[in-house]
């Protein structure tokens, strides 16, 4: 009877687990196919009038092409165009970049009317026939099936094109001067397939499915408690176990058991992570993810803002949804990076309090070894800091991997299946953070055999249906997360676009990920990142060698150690299936690296005492890792480099490369190991005396090496923040945000970038009473070789050459990328005739009517020289700290570190104008020139360089080089009237912030996207020239579906001079101002008609056009 009672007590939870599991599985499987409510958006034209005629409208579609387009123009309206023709109608303004290549254009000349979709003619009609009334209406259309046009009534004047010719729409533009009337219409159905919300039915199913899965897991937990055997597990603790055994007043005692070493390690690791949170460098994708999070509420979904034609980020979007919630509180970096830091803290506490105790329980085990605990902390931090201090998903993936491993171990240790079910949920949540989150599945795979044995062992009491149903239901729960608002059709379409646009790299080329780590002069192959990956690989393969050779390490549990090694190895294998191969994805292994570090240090402390040669080989390997790591630069992303030593070179000490020092030491220890190996045949023994000193020496090499790297990394960034203060750094911005209480008045880089809204306002005036020649005061008395038209026509700057592996770069993965990048208006050309007869197109908004130019271009027979008249300096004030000369060509200058850029001599000479009318020359100074040559740029002469008595200045130019490439041109000096970028732009003006800059300007508002239509920005904030050329201009390109798709089609740009406060040598980036090609009063923003329709989960509204 007791046995029957036990059977009955098992039957109920077993039945509940089976029924709830099957129900949860079926409900969750149905979620992707259930209907959703899709917001529809339509633009109708005409809208309003200008001077009694139909007005043009602006409506830049995020997807480029619409879902459907239908335009009808009465032929009598076409006949109203002038005799020489004009624009009948178009979907892009004619002056935009590649307008004809991308848009629909209906043009008329004196002979014909032509309808062209993307430079392909669809229909042609003779203009006299149109004017004579032979046709009634011109009809043009495009949809998922085809594109075409027809002059109704004219035989043969029609044509159809493939659907790939569907045009890009930025609005409706026309030269027609006709009133709105019957037959004149345009309809643009915007592609809003991703702006969806679950229907009531879908919400009910998701809620019921989630509840059913949770019920099944709870029922399985009840089965676990009733089915477990009498065996107990010694020294096992996990967060789940701790919570289940929580008793008030007892938890502190449990935590004290870990020992003093663990508490010291906890304090050191947590302090380092918190310090790094403030001073540490950010990741390459902080701006990317922050902008997506900020625009999501108005966009209606988590839109891929910088690429991929406005597709959704699903299935990898739940983390971005979390960031969007955080951004609604504050966009300050120190706030937005909290998830990453909390994930780091969580990872370490799991390692120190549970993973190590699982790997080596007991008094003599790994968890009780102080050096192993300290090594775990050092290796973990060394692996965490270079990768995981930003908004990328790797920090959460690292945490998810550890939690999954821990739950699997709990399931195995206690022979319980509920932790395994929870592990499945956690692993799949981790996998949907990003493609590299797939490594969390490795923990499931390595523990699957042991879990399967537990299922078989309990088959008699629990059966197979209940546990398998629960595990399958747990597996299906991820569908609720991924398809909570999207459908299977939209997610598949998003994936199709991403694979079509790229970049994607095949799985068998995963070696490129490791190659990127070796690329010099690249932050992704920096010293810190190289060390993190190399030391993890050393620990992984070192432990494999030790265990395969020796089979057992006393003090280390056999099963968990193999599953830890297997999780890492299988994780690296699964990483090959990610479509991108960025080196930053190694950050997902940070938690595993820390645990492997402890395991390796403990194992080597045991075997090192057995054989001197093995210990020496261990030290040799570590020295070689250091040598390889320090062959990279101490580089960090973008502003993370500010003030950091060796950010662009290999570390050096006393002019000697550090890498050579470590390589020499590794060679010496390698030779010593070889000598010890051959001596083994003659020595009586090779063991080291088992003393405390020798045990410490055998176990500490990895600890010492990892600590050196951690101290170097933290000291580098801290030094930059402290010694540069009050100049801009990430640390300064974070401290300011904290001090302000995350106030919106703390605006990071926008508070330190000085902008010159009107370059003409600061122009200096000549000192009265001077004489000068016909070229004006800028030419001085008798210029030789310098003339107003001495400026080259083509001032395109030298190319930027970057090496492979740069994140968010659409360049070749295996050869250098050569790209050009010039600020708007700086690449030369012809412009209006200037005040002294120059025809050069001036940059930075300089007014040619007030700005003379002198240059030596074309003077190839004698040395050119010119000394300008004296210009009056204004009284010195803190808000006007510079004298600036806009110049082009090759100019000699020195960088901050003393290296020079070759060119010809342009100097500024200070002087003193005395009351008696005389002028006394003072010192001459060379400019600060951030480049690039030969484009127009602003040479800087800090007024702090001027003698206190100086009140005038003049330009002294000398060009003795007769080479056609060695010339330069200049404009008069000015003292810019500046204001901060925050004062110029404010927090409400829409701005296009490039990926690299977006996280550094938290107060600026990224242009919004609403109902599939983009808001046109007024400004663009760019990073430094190299980053712009290698990343921004490629990743955000129109061909890839980035914002340039509509920005370059609808806007023109001009560069605003900017300077980073106090950091005059710094190329921080630039600011460009946008102007509409068709002004807003002529083509106002379109009114959009909004609606809602219900679509099924499998419904596909045709492919999004994603062709170049």
Swiss-Prot record:
Matches recorded under InterPro entries: Arabino_trans_C (IPR032731), Arabino_trans_C_2 (IPR042486), Arabino_trans_central (IPR007680), Arabino_trans_N (IPR040920), EmbABC_dom1 (IPR027451)
Leading EC class: transferase
Pfam families in UniProt: Arabino_trans_C, Arabino_trans_N, Arabinose_trans
First-listed, main subcellular location of the protein, grouped into a coarse class: membrane
UniProt-annotated location(s): Cell membrane
Single GO cellular component term: plasma membrane
One annotated GO molecular function: arabinosyltransferase activity
Bilayer-crossing regions: 12-34, 204-223, 258-280, 334-356, 368-387, 397-414, 421-443, 463-482, 531-553, 582-604, 616-638, 653-675, 696-718
Record carries keyword Glycosyltransferase: yes
Family: Belongs to the emb family.
Role, per record: Arabinosyl transferase responsible for the polymerization of arabinose into the arabinan of arabinogalactan.
Stated name of the protein: Probable arabinosyltransferase A
Native species: Mycobacterium avium
Name of the coding gene: embA
């Amino acid at each position: 009877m007791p046995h029957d009672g036990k059977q009955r007590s098992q039957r109920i939870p077993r039945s509940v687990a089976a029924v709830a599991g099957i129900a949860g599985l079926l409900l969750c499987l149905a979620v992707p196919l259930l209907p959703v409510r899709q917001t529809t958006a339509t633009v109708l034209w005409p809208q309003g009038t200008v001077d009694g005629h139909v007005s043009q409208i602006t409506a830049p579609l995020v997807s480029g092409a619409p879902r459907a387009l239908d335009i009808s123009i009465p032929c009598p309206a076409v006949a109203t165009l002038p005799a020489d023709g004009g624009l009948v109608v178009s979907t892009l303004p004619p002056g935009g970049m590649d307008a004809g290549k991308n848009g629909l254009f209906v043009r008329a000349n004196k002979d014909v009317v032509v309808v062209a979709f993307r430079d392909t003619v669809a229909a042609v009609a003779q203009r006299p026939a149109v004017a004579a009334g032979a046709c009634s209406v011109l009809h043009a259309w495009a949809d998922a099936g085809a594109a075409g046009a027809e002059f109704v009534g004219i035989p043969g004047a029609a044509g159809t094109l493939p659907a790939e010719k569907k045009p890009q729409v930025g609005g409706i533009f026309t030269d027609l001067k006709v009133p709105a009337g019957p037959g004149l219409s345009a309809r643009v159905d915007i592609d809003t397939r991703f702006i969806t919300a679950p229907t009531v039915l879908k919400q009910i199913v998701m809620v019921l499915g989630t509840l059913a899965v949770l019920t099944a897991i709870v029922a399985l937990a009840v089965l676990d408690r009733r089915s477990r055997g009498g065996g107990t597990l010694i020294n096992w603790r996990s967060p789940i176990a701790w919570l289940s055994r929580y008793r008030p007043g007892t938890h502190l005692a449990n935590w004290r058991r870990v020992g003093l070493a663990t508490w010291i390690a906890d304090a050191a690791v947590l302090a380092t992570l918190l310090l790094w949170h403030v001073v540490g460098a950010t990741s390459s994708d902080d701006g990317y993810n922050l902008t997506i999070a900020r625009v999501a509420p108005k966009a209606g979904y988590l839109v891929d803002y910088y690429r991929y034609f406005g597709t959704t980020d699903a299935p990898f979007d739940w983390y971005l949804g979390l960031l969007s919630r955080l951004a609604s509180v504050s966009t300050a970096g120190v706030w937005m990076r909290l998830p990453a830091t909390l994930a780091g803290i969580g990872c370490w506490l799991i390692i120190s309090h549970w993973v190590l105790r699982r790997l080596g329980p007991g008094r003599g085990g790994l968890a009780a070894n102080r050096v192993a605990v300290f090594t775990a902390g050092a290796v973990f931090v060394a692996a965490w800091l270079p990768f995981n201090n930003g908004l990328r998903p790797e920090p959460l993936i690292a945490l998810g991997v550890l939690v999954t491993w821990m739950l699997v171990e709990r399931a195995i240790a206690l022979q319980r299946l509920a932790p395994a079910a929870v592990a499945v949920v956690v692993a799949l949540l981790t996998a949907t953070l990003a493609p590299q989150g797939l490594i969390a599945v490795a923990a499931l795979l390595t523990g699957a055999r042991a879990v399967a044995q537990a299922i078989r062992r309990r088959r008699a009491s629990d059966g197979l249906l209940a546990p398998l149903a629960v595990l399958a239901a747990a597996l299906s729960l991820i569908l609720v997360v991924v398809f909570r608002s999207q459908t299977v059709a939209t997610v598949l379409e998003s994936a199709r676009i991403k694979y079509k646009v790229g970049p994607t790299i095949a799985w068998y080329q995963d070696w490129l990920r490791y190659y990127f780590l070796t690329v010099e002069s690249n932050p992704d192959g920096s010293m810190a990142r190289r060390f993190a990956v190399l030391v993890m690989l050393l620990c992984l393969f070192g432990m494999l060698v030790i265990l395969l050779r020796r089979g057992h390490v006393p003090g280390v549990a056999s099963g968990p150690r193999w599953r830890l090694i297997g999780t890492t190895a299988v994780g690296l294998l699964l990483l090959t299936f990610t479509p991108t191969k960025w080196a930053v994805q190694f950050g997902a292994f940070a938690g595993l690296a820390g645990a492997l570090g402890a395991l390796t240090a403990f194992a080597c402390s045991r075997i090192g005492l057995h054989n001197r040669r093995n210990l020496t080989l261990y030290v040799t390997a570590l020295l070689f890792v250091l040598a390889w790591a320090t062959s990279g630069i101490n580089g960090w992303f973008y502003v993370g480099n500010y003030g950091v030593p060796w950010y662009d070179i290999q570390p050096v000490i006393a002019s000697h490369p550090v890498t050579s020092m470590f390589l020499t030491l590794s060679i010496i220890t390698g030779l010593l190991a070889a000598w010890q190996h051959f001596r083994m045949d003659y020595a009586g023994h090779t063991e080291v005396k088992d003393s405390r000193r020798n045990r410490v020496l055998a176990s500490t090499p990895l600890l010492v090496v990892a600590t050196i790297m951690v101290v170097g990394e933290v000291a580098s960034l801290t030094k930059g923040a402290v010694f540069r203060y009050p100049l801009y750094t990430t640390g300064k911005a974070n401290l300011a945000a904290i001090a302000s209480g995350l106030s919106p008045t703390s605006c990071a880089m926008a508070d330190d970038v000085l902008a010159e809204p009107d370059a003409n306002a600061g122009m200096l005036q000549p000192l009265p009473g001077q004489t000068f020649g016909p070229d004006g005061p800028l030419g001085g008395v008798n210029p030789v070789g310098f003339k107003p038209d001495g400026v080259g026509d083509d001032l395109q700057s030298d190319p930027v050459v970057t090496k492979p592996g740069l994140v968010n770069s659409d360049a070749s993965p295996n050869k250098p990328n050569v790209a050009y990048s010039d600020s708007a208006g700086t690449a030369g050309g012809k412009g209006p005739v200037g005040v002294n007869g120059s025809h050069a197109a001036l940059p930075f908004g300089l007014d040619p009517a007030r700005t003379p130019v002198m240059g030596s271009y074309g003077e190839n027979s004698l040395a050119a020289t010119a000394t300008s008249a004296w210009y009056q300096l204004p009284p010195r004030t803190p808000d006007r700290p510079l004298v600036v000369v806009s110049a082009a060509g090759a100019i000699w200058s020195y960088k901050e570190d003393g290296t020079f850029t070759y060119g010809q001599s342009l100097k500024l000479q200070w002087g003193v104008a005395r009351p008696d009318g005389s002028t006394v020359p003072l010192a001459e100074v060379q400019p600060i020139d951030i480049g690039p040559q030969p484009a127009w740029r602003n040479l800087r002469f800090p007024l702090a360089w001027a003698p206190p008595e100086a009140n005038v200045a003049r330009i002294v130019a000398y060009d003795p080089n007769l080479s056609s490439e060695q010339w330069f041109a200049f404009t008069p000096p000015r003292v810019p009237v500046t204001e901060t970028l925050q004062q110029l732009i404010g927090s409400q003006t829409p701005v296009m912030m490039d990926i690299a800059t977006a996280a550094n300007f938290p107060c600026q508002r990224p242009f919004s996207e609403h109902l599939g239509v983009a808001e046109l920005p007024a400004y663009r904030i760019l990073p430094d020239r190299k980053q712009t050329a290698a990343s921004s201009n490629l990743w955000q390109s129109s061909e890839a579906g980035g914002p340039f798709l509509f920005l370059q089609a609808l806007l023109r740009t001009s560069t605003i001079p900017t300077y980073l406060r106090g950091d005059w040598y710094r190329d921080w980036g630039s600011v460009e101002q946008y102007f509409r090609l068709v002004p807003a009063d002529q083509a106002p923003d379109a009114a959009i008609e909004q609606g809602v329709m219900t679509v099924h989960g499998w419904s596909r509204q045709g492919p999004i056009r994603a062709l170049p």
